[in-house]
Amino acid sequence: MQQVKSSLIKSIGYNPLTEQLSVVLHTSPSTVFNYDGVSRATVNNFTNATSKGQFFNSKIRGRFPTSKSVI
């Protein structure tokens, strides 16, 4: 997991073999939200976005199968 500069998102991680994006939000720091089927291009756009929270809400949240786990 990599810390990011965002008021919404605490950290993100990505497994290119399974195309799974993992996101930890500041509001739920003990929960990892896992998004399946996220392409490398989408992750690159996400990590390079000026507003990661806005990108997350418009391009990721609610658009991919999601599971969550407690850390």
Give the predicted meaning of each segment.
Residues 1-71:
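Acidic/histidine-enriched, beta-strand-rich ligand/metal-binding domains
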